Amino acid sequence: MSTRANTLQENSATEFSSIGPDVWQGKENPLFIESDNLCAAWKTHALENDHLSVRIGRWNIPGEPIVILVDFQPFFEKKNDIYTEMWNRFQVDSLHAYGDYDEASMFSYAAGRVVESFYRYNLTETDKVVYQAHEWMTGMGALYVQEAVPEVATIFTTHATSSDVR
């Protein structure tokens, strides 16, 4: 992100923000500059009405893009329900997952919930919004957004390569 954020902001007529996991909880993050003013009313709404704990600020990188950090830990207690929902709606099979699948999925789901909450509170269907998910780790959030906020366009980017050239 540090190599692209400045370019995105300079060459775009739109706002650019990102959503990240709040893994530093309670500790100072040298890459994050927290703001008490950015989206303050929505932040309160998100916590009180949508049960989303977020911190809002800017990445401490060139361009200083806005970032919303979300605490995704509370979603672990609902993990089985979330996976059931993903299976029923999209046939995403989480039964045989391993490694960092759970952590990535819970963050991704939380990010999707953040988009839904932010959109419903701040925007209307005439606003043009794109949710870009990078790699499989954020795919669940894109699926959630497609279902919960169909007004938001979704893009999935993968950087996978294959050495199996035929």
What spans do the regions from the language model cover?
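Catalytic cores of nucleotide-sugar-dependent glycosyltransferases that transfer UDP/GDP/TDP-activated
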Residues: 1-166
